From Swiss-Prot:
Pathway: Secondary metabolite biosynthesis; terpenoid biosynthesis. Its EC number is 1.14.13.-. It comes from Aspergillus calidoustus. Binds 1 FAD per subunit. It comes from the Eukaryota. This is FAD-binding monooxygenase ausB. Residues 15-24, 31-43 have a biased composition (Polar residues). The record marks R413 as: Transition state stabilizer. Belongs to the FAD-binding monooxygenase family. Keywords: FAD, Flavoprotein, Monooxygenase, NADP, Oxidoreductase. Its cofactor is FAD. FAD-binding monooxygenase; part of the gene cluster that mediates the biosynthesis of calidodehydroaustin, a fungal meroterpenoid. The first step of the pathway is the synthesis of 3,5-dimethylorsellinic acid by the polyketide synthase ausA. 3,5-dimethylorsellinic acid is then prenylated by the polyprenyl transferase ausN. Further epoxidation by the FAD-dependent monooxygenase ausM and cyclization by the probable terpene cyclase ausL lead to the formation of protoaustinoid A. It is an enzyme of class 1 (oxidoreductase). Residues 1-50 are annotated as: Disordered.
Length: 632
């Protein structure tokens, strides 16, 4: 077994600095202050150091070579950016609406289907949303997930299954990074420019009548500006580009044989870190975990899918079971249980047991006068349970106290795992509490204060660049609309129709979070947006004939009315104003914005169910209210 970690010098922490903070309602202001203090010590976000150009695809050797870029069609009726779950859902809903495969073209910078599940293949990877509601189109494909929470390889394989089921393989261009979308007013189309992901000198152009941006948000690995990073002589990589050539092993296999005798550092303790840390501890000689703000980690209680239960409960259910189950989940995470008024909790996991997360995603009671008090009370109870698990699991008292998370549950996405806290009982694993120090790299290690921790490998579990919510920024695409206006200019004061269209950028759809409903299950969000866009394009294109050229965009009045309606719900997210900069909450990312500007970037405050009802009512009316439609 590996030996206990060794360091060059040891600085004994002040016991007073690690004193446990309790989180009862009476002392919640203390927890707020603790979180505010922690926020000031987070990793500096700017001056990106690209260890390896993120265009590099380490998985190309695992699949068939991408088609020659010249063979990717230069013309599409509907161009979809992204071939992950989001892009696939848009393609499938369009096909169901009556479009032909030849009408659709998907392009992706990756060399295979899966989106974030293509790029992320680190050891221990799995979804943290129940697979029965997260893996899309289970009902249509007939696939039965292997477990309540499935590993990453199964998630990626399911994306390939969807593509094969609907014949999308021949309608997808892989290894293509779109760089610019430019509206051609005369041609009533989008001119698309890009190039090979790994060789931008190989150019690709395309024209499309309609463009859908379905790239998601987890597509830009965040590499912090660590002092001394350039002088470190060991190996470094980001979890989104796991280097199995260095660690040994392969995706889907837990063993990392080449780490035998290696000293490994993990920087970051978010949702990715809590999955890789137990795996690294099994293989590394020594493991150092550098933590600034502890994660809130609840028990996941994963289990294999019971086939008898599946046949009885799922296969015999009426059509639409997956959507109903997903909406049950949405309700339970956004509404206090005592006022829910719906059937049983079908998911029954860590997410649905603590609905205080509604403070981050919106909900039907968020605008009630007592919401903040109610959410704080529920969240304090959740936090006490997590603290009790830590205190009864982790043997070393200082380590246990350092692992106590004092933040509100809505400030960072909660984590769920089995075995994370137990890892800190292993002799070869050391938690380094770095909340009071900036990290510095030396030529052979990581320095915190006066202590240097010698390491051979640094794994950056530092997440993704969230930054602006602008569709162009999220997709890393320059979008130029009518009259040369750039999307970033429009997004300084965004106005949309339904959160997916904006005036000045005709025939462009961009599902996101601003002025739209959100939930923890992103697959559900994509599916509702895909359903809505498919309805619009079916009604306007197929009913008028495929040869009709259309120019559609919101009217000025309609998008301002929608923006105002969304802004009126902004106080639903008042609780997130206290969250630290660097968390994923929108208010934190727009800390310098005034209230009116910030409110336009926020989601639909009344929650996902309210948002979906509004879209359904709009479609039922059948009038295309708010759309300016010009046909030739």
């Amino acid at each position: 077994m590996a030996s206990a970690p060794e360091v060059e010098s040891v600085k004994t922490p002040d016991p007073a600095s690690t004193k446990t903070q309790h989180t009862s309602i009476a002392e919640i202001h203390t927890a707020d202050q603790t979180w505010n203090n922690e926020s000031n010590t987070r990793l500096p976000p700017n001056h990106r150091h690209h260890l390896r150009d993120t265009r590099y695809d380490p998985w190309t050797h695992n699949g068939s070579p991408p088609a020659e870029i010249s063979k990717i069609p230069p013309r599409a009726k509907v161009l979809i950016l992204g071939a992950g779950y989001g892009g696939l859902l848009f393609a499938v809903r369009l096909l169901e609406a009556g479009f032909q495969p030849s009408d659709i073209l998907l392009v992706d910078a990756a060399h295979g289907f899966g989106g974030t599940w293509y790029w992320n293949r680190y050891p221990g990877l799995m979804c943290d949303i129940e697979s029965y509601i997260y893996m899309p189109l289970l009902e249509e494909t007939g696939y039965i997930p292997s477990a309540k929470y499935v590993p990453g390889e199964e998630l990626r394989s399911h994306a390939e299954r969807i593509a094969q089921h609907w014949g999308l393989g021949t309608r997808t261009g892989f290894g293509v990074r779109v760089e610019e979308l430019r509206w051609d007013e005369k041609g009533i189309r989008w001119d698309v420019r890009g190039g090979r992901t790994q060789d931008p000198t190989m150019r690709w152009t395309c024209t499309a009548d309609f463009v859908i941006i379905a790239t998601g948000t987890l597509n830009r690995p965040r590499v912090p500006d660590l002092a001394g990073l350039d002088m470190f002589t060991g190996h470094v990589f980001h979890t989104a580009r796991w280097d199995y050539n260095y660690t040994g092993g392969a995706p889907g296999t837990p063993a990392l044989p080449r780490l035998d005798g290696k000293r490994v550092a993990v920087i970051g303790t978010g949702s990715t870190a809590i999955q890789i840390i137990p795996q690294l501890a099994k293989s590394a000689e020594q493991l150092f975990v550098f933590q600034r703000t502890p994660a809130s980690v609840g028990l996941q209680r994963n289990r294999p899918t019971d086939r008898e239960w599946w046949e009885k409960t799922i296969q015999n259910a009426a059509p639409g079971w997956q959507r109903r189950r997903a909406e049950n989940f949405n309700a339970w995470i956004s509404t206090p249980h005592e006022v829910l008024g719906i059937e049983e909790d079908l998911i029954s996991d860590g997410w649905t047991s603590a609905p205080s997360f509604a403070a981050a995603i919106g909900g039907p009671l968020n605008l009630a006068p007592d919401f903040l008090h109610r959410a704080t009370e529920v969240d304090a109870a959740r936090r006490r349970i997590v603290h009790q698990v830590i205190e009864t699991t982790v043997k070393d008292r200082r380590t246990a106290e350092a692992l106590l998370n004092h933040a509100h549950g809505w400030c960072k996405r909660p984590c769920f795992h089995e075995g994370y806290f137990e890892t800190y009982n292993l002799a070869n694993t050391l938690l380094v509490d770095a909340r009071d120090h900036q990290l510095h790299l030396t030529h052979d290690g990581v320095q915190v204060g006066d202590t240097v921790y010698p390491v051979d490998l640094i794994v950056l579990a530092t997440g993704y660049e969230l930054g602006s919510l602008c569709p162009a920024t999220r997709a890393q695409v320059r979008i130029v609309g009518v009259g040369g206006q750039q999307m970033e200019e429009k997004w300084a004061r965004p106005a949309t129709l339904h959160g997916i269209m904006t005036r000045g950028f005709p025939n462009l759809f961009f599902p996101g979070t601003s002025q739209a409903g959100v939930t923890a299950n992103q697959s559900y969000m994509f599916d509702r947006a895909a359903e809505h866009v498919a309805y619009i394009l079916h009604a306007l294109c197929l009913r008028r004939g495929t040869e009709t050229r259309l120019r559609l965009q919101p009217t000025v009045e309609a998008e301002e009315q929608w923006a105002t309606r969304s802004v009126d719900q902004a106080r639903a997210f008042a609780a997130t104003r206290a969250c630290a900069v660097g968390s994923y909450t929108i208010a934190a990312r727009y800390e310098s914005a005034d209230g009116a500007a910030l409110a336009r970037h926020l989601p639909w405050g009344e929650g996902m169910a309210s948002y979906v009802r509004v879209l359904e009512q709009w479609r039922e009316a059948g009038t295309m209210e708010g759309l300016e439609i010009v046909s030739e």
